[in-house]
């Protein structure tokens, strides 16, 4: 017996297994090599979604159903290896949400942690627990678990962002709760930008008391993130596997900005090719700027601004930028690290 071989099935064993089944029992040795694998094994598949194709379908959806009727008008980025499960990886969800000028996505809250990464348009607002923020392309916005949130588009342009949630994790633990607010728009009790000013300047209020596990900042503006990357670029210090890669953090503890999802931004200079890398956290990428290609296992995907692609767990990956490129990404790394599962391999 080993982790790669199953014991032979004899007539006597087969009869025994049939008797076990009628009593809701099963022999571990028949499935051990499937539940304890020698390396990560998943149905999650490498894939790329072209934004222009998805946008066309989103705009068509906008003619068929309102944001209010749908609660959230979203097209799920469903991994082709995980059909029917509403997942982009085994543990994470992704979707593209459209909100048209004048529309409101009503206030609600739920157990799931959510991120919004703005892909197209600009000027729409998200409100979280009494504070409203105006969103622009490249902004990383957090909705903590059980926080009231709504979306309003007072601009004259459609806006599309990527939703990233830990839906499969919450489903795994059977811990999903959700409720509506009763009104479309929640009461605004704090000025726009309050949380960034209060917690995003290397200071904290003297009487601060932590609430929850998420970052108290809920909008990380792309303008500031891009400036940081540009300044660090001058040092000419490039990680061979990542280029210049930074993690969005919770200023209270320096850890990931969200309790179950790690989020990153990275710069790949023109003609930079990363060395082979793999890690156990399947990762979703959204291209902010530039173009290039990524080899995932034995497949090569060519990408450009606004496209989305996914790298499954433990697949070897190499990025190559044909122009200066900036990528946003998110994964379940922080959850894996807290549980002692996470592993990486370079070269």
Curated annotation (Swiss-Prot):
Effect of residue 338 to Y: 1.5-fold increase in relative activity towards gentisate
Pfam families reported for this sequence: Cupin_2 (PF07883)
Enzymatic class: oxidoreductase
EC number(s) given by UniProt: 1.13.11.4
Resulting phenotype, residue 181 to D/H: Does not improve specific activity towards gentisate
Catalytic activity: 2,5-dihydroxybenzoate + O2 = 3-maleylpyruvate + H(+)
Protein task: Involved in the degradation of gentisate. Catalyzes the conversion of gentisate (2,5-dihydroxybenzoate) to maleylpyruvate. Exhibits broad substrate specificities towards alkyl and halogenated gentisates.
Family: Belongs to the gentisate 1,2-dioxygenase family.
Subunit relationships: Homotetramer.
Name this protein carries in UniProt: Gentisate 1,2 dioxygenase 1
Originating species: Aquipseudomonas alcaligenes (Pseudomonas alcaligenes)
Gene that this sequence comes from: xlnE
